[in-house]
From Swiss-Prot:
This is ATP synthase subunit alpha. It catalyses: ATP + H2O + 4 H(+)(in) = ADP + phosphate + 5 H(+)(out). One of its GO terms (molecular function) is ADP binding. PANTHER family: ATP SYNTHASE SUBUNIT ALPHA, MITOCHONDRIAL. Its EC number is 7.1.2.2. It is a peripheral membrane protein. The gene is atpA. ATP binds at G169, D170, R171, Q172, T173, G174, K175, T176. It is an enzyme of class 7 (translocase). CDD domains: ATP-synt_F1_alpha_C, ATP-synt_F1_alpha_N, F1-ATPase_alpha_CD. F-type ATPases have 2 components, CF(1) - the catalytic core - and CF(0) - the membrane proton channel. CF(1) has five subunits: alpha(3), beta(3), gamma(1), delta(1), epsilon(1). CF(0) has three main subunits: a(1), b(2) and c(9-12). The alpha and beta chains form an alternating ring which encloses part of the gamma chain. CF(1) is attached to CF(0) by a central stalk formed by the gamma and epsilon chains, while a peripheral stalk is formed by the delta and b chains. GO terms for cellular component: plasma membrane; proton-transporting ATP synthase complex. Produces ATP from ADP in the presence of a proton gradient across the membrane. The alpha chain is a regulatory subunit.
Length: 509
């Protein structure tokens, strides 16, 4: 065998040249105690608040309590494999998640790992989950409508891009249904080519049953809405730290769109469960409890999350992130700690009531208690013109209906008001999964506020609406297109709409 000395020496030289002299230094600590998803670790003196640490078993955790002699770490996973005396390694990284368009159509956990069995996430960028909200100067006031497709919301409680609108109500009142319809309503925009009209959807499920989340994802998939949506799931069986983190992870994913001049909406379903998870972590970390045993900084938990929803100014790309937090109340008690906190942080609330739900008013929006602090600034001119009257009429109707229970002999004006009110209430009902376009809502509400429904029996209002819409879609598509493109109800369009509604009202009876 021929041994070439020159060749061997060249190989040796190459290997010696690449030999690194620096030793790798990692800061490690030791587990003092572990239990209830919390580990006390000794020795990580330079660890940062919110930094990821890794246990011997490969499970990761987050340093939350930095105390004098130890660090309180919350564990992202099961603590069964973590034993006292094991080593814990610093990662040097604050908790971050993958972001970008590669996440669209996927279901991920609170750390951004895929849980839908569709393979790895294709993402080039990562972002920290907990960042500072945009300052005052880069923002712009909310002025573009964020259409939900629901008449009662778009007409009475309009939501704008960059707004935070709370959806609040007892369990089983249709809170998630409003969020779901909002996502489905974005489909026509995504089928078009106008990038500015597109609204990407991020849905964060916190503490829900896995079957519920699976059903939600299936509805999105069946309706072709999953392609422009991201679902982050921290279900009831996940550890409390994951439920605490999920809304922040979702927000980071939504901010990618906001900061790149695009528009997104994020739905936190729901923040009451996040607060409960945070309370559990805080109490186990021995932080002092406050009202309802929540820690003192539970307000800051939600305010720093919701302040990240914003409408950016032109200099910052003119993107937006709209937040729709959901809060579950107990027996309609909005004066509990978490509901009052979130009401004071958000720009308005959609209040859903069990009684209305069982009366068949669905969506079960209590128009009197619901409010949008952005108001008509987030409505198109066409909607503003027709919906301006409906608020006042419904307010008067509610007032009169309360009095009418006592007296039987009502004058003609009051009777007229009650008639109109009951028909408008019927008009605002809408079945699930059938969002309406803005121009269709304008036409229907126009018919209601201008008295074309007054002579029609209440139980026929739904049929009138369906008939009017099919007439408009079939024979007067150009009129709907005019309203859609101009976003206004000009004199010509109004006259044409009046003619269509009048002739339809005559033929319908």
């Amino acid at each position: 065998m021929d041994i070439r000395a020159a060749e061997i020496s060249a190989i040796l030289k190459e290997q010696i040249k690449n030999f690194g002299q620096e030793a790798e230094v990692t800061e490690v600590g030791q587990v003092l105690s572990v239990g209830d998803g919390i580990a006390r670790v000794y020795g990580l003196d330079n660890v940062q608040a919110g930094e990821m640490v890794e246990f011997e078993s490969g499970v990761r955790g987050m340093a939350l309590n930095l105390e004098q002699d130890n660090v309180g770490v919350v564990i992202f996973g099961v603590d069964r494999d973590i034993k006292e005396g094991q080593t814990v390694k610093r990662t040097g990284a604050i908790v971050d998640v993958p972001v970008g368009k590669g996440l669209l159509g996927r279901v991920v956990d609170a750390l951004g790992n895929p849980i839908d069995g569709k393979g790895p996430i294709v993402s080039t960028e990562r972002r920290r989950v907990d960042v500072k909200a945009p300052g005052i100067i880069p923002r712009k006031s909310v002025h573009e409508p964020m259409a939900t497709g629901l008449k009662s919301v778009d007409a009475l409680i309009p939501i704008g891009r960059g707004q935070r609108e709370l959806i609040i109500g007892d369990r089983q009142t249709g809170k998630t249904a409003i969020a779901l319809d909002t996502i489905l309503n974005q489909k026509p925009a995504h089928e078009g080519t106008d990038e500015k009209a597109k609204l990407y959807c991020v849905y964060v499920a916190v503490g829900q049953k896995r079957s519920t989340v699976a059903q939600f994802v299936k509805v999105l998939e069946d309706n072709g809405a999953l392609d422009y949506s991201i679902v982050i799931a921290a279900t009831a069986s996940d550890p409390a730290p994951m439920q605490f983190l999920a809304p922040f992870s979702g927000c980071a994913m939504g901010e990618f769109f906001r900061d790149n001049g695009m528009h997104a909406v994020i739905i936190y379903d729901d923040l009451s469960k996040q607060a409960v998870a945070y309370r559990q972590m805080s109490l186990l970390l021995r932080r002092p409890p406050g009202r309802e045993a929540y820690p003192g900084d539970v307000f800051y938990l939600h305010s720093r999350l919701l302040e990240r929803a914003a409408k950016m100014g032109d200099a910052a790309g003119a993107g937006s992130l709209t937040a729709l937090p959901v809060i579950e109340t107990q027996a309609n008690d909005v004066s509990a700690y978490i509901p009052t906190n979130v009401i004071s942080i958000t720009d308005g609330q959609i209040f859903l009531e069990t009684d209305l739900f069982y009366q068949g008013v669905r969506p079960a929006v209590n128009v009197g208690l619901s409010v949008s602090r952005v108001g008509s600034a987030a409505q198109t001119k066409a909607m503003k013109k027709v919906a301006g009257k409906i608020k006042g009429e419904l307010a008067q109707y509610r007032e009169m209906a309360a009095f009418a229970q006592f007296g039987s002999d009502l004058d003609a004006a009051t009777q007229r008001l009650l008639n109109r009110g009951s028909r408008l209430t019927e008009l605002l009902k809408q079945p699930q999964f059938s969002p309406l376009k803005m121009e269709e809502q304008v036409a229907v509400i126009y018919a209601g506020v201008n008295g074309y429904l007054d002579a029609i029996p209440v139980n026929r209002v739904r049929a009138f609406e369906d008939g009017l819409l099919s007439t408009l879609r079939g024979r007067h598509a150009d009129l709907l297109e005019t309203i859609r493109t101009s976003k206004d109800l000009g004199d010509d369009a109004a006259a044409k709409l009046k003619g269509v509604v009048e002739s339809f009202a005559k033929s319908f009876s």
